């Protein structure tokens, strides 16, 4: 009985500390999130009654979610709740799994991406993706950045040079790498590799950037740099980011969707989610009571 009481006190202490830490982040970001009203922003993605199955496993259930342009939208939730599956559905990469079946609609710029004649190639050009582990190609930094443009038919050396500089500047890493463009990207640190992957994504000028836990494999300094970069990128791109880090979601996002057991349990302004959630399960998750 004594051990049980000790554990309960430890859990309560941990919960209070987690909530206090997140509240501090939310409070410090209050001005940042005081932006134009949602009514002035266009919907870039509208998910309507989406269900998804892996074979007989019902992984996503009745997802309804409108994602606004030039926002950072955080997708949070415990492992196995459908976060990564959802964002991989947004560019149809999930269909690389043979057993996948979907029902419902996802409208990207008012067009249903599941329509028979909708081009997956065009979708993946417009919607870039950055993965959990940095995954540069085993090529030079220059060749990593120019891979996409060359695939799209750009051959002019001067234009490619301009794309490389613009993309690396966009990823806030040009000054670090401008004298190393022809060295292998594998020789970079993890944080540098991830920013090169972001630059590679920017090189094809996407409209939306999907990020699947982009800092989980990085050290704290590299994580901070990527978070600062995300804040800069949202001026020109719409960013949807999966994260397990509650403080990170509170720091960088404008909207937050909490997924639980394949459902969207709650979706609202990030400040609202972390300071005054409407649902008890949301409150329990962000305060560390489960997950």
Curated annotation (Swiss-Prot):
Residues 1-40 are annotated as: Disordered. NCBIfam families: 3a0107s01c2. The complex is composed of two ATP-binding proteins (PstB), two transmembrane proteins (PstC and PstA) and a solute-binding protein (PstS). It comes from Staphylococcus haemolyticus (strain JCSC1435). Its EC number is 7.3.2.1. This is Phosphate import ATP-binding protein PstB. GO terms for cellular component: plasma membrane. The gene is pstB. It catalyses: phosphate(out) + ATP + H2O = ADP + 2 phosphate(in) + H(+). The keyword Transmembrane does not apply. ATP binds at residues 77-84. SMART domains: AAA. Belongs to the ABC transporter superfamily. Phosphate importer (TC 3.A.1.7) family. Residues 1-17, 30-40 have a biased composition (Basic and acidic residues).
């Amino acid at each position: 009985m004594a051990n049980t009481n000790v554990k309960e006190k430890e859990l309560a202490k941990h919960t209070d500390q987690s909530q206090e830490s997140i509240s501090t982040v939310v409070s410090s970001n209050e001005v940042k999130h005081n932006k134009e009203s949602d009514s002035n922003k266009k919907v870039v993605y509208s998910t309507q009654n989406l269900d998804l199955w892996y074979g007989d496993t019902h992984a996503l259930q009745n997802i309804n979610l409108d994602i606004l342009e030039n926002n950072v939208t955080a997708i949070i939730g415990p492992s196995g709740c459908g976060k990564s599956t959802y964002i991989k559905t947004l560019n149809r990469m999930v269909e690389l799994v043979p057993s996948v079946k979907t029902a419902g609609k996802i409208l990207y710029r008012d067009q249903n991406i599941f329509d028979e004649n909708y081009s997956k190639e065009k979708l993946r050009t417009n919607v870039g993706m950055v993965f959990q582990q940095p995954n540069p190609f085993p090529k030079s930094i220059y060749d990593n950045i120019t891979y996409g443009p060359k695939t799209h038919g750009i051959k002019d050396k001067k234009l490619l040079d301009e794309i490389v500089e613009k993309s690396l500047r966009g990823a806030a890493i040009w000054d670090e790498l401008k004298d190393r463009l022809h060295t292998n990207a594998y020789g970079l640190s993890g944080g540098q590799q991830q920013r090169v992957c972001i630059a590679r994504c920017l090189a094809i000028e996407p409209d939306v950037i999907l990020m699947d836990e982009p800092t989980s494999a990085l050290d704290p300094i590299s994580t901070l740099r990527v978070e600062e970069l995300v804040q800069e990128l949202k001026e020109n791109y719409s960013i949807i980011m999966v994260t397990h880090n509650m403080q990170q979601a509170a720091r960088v996002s404008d909207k937050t969707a909490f997924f639980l057991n394949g459902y969207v349990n709650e979706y609202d302004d990030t400040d609202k989610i972390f300071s005054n959630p409407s649902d008890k399960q949301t409150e329990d998750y962000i305060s560390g009571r489960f997950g």
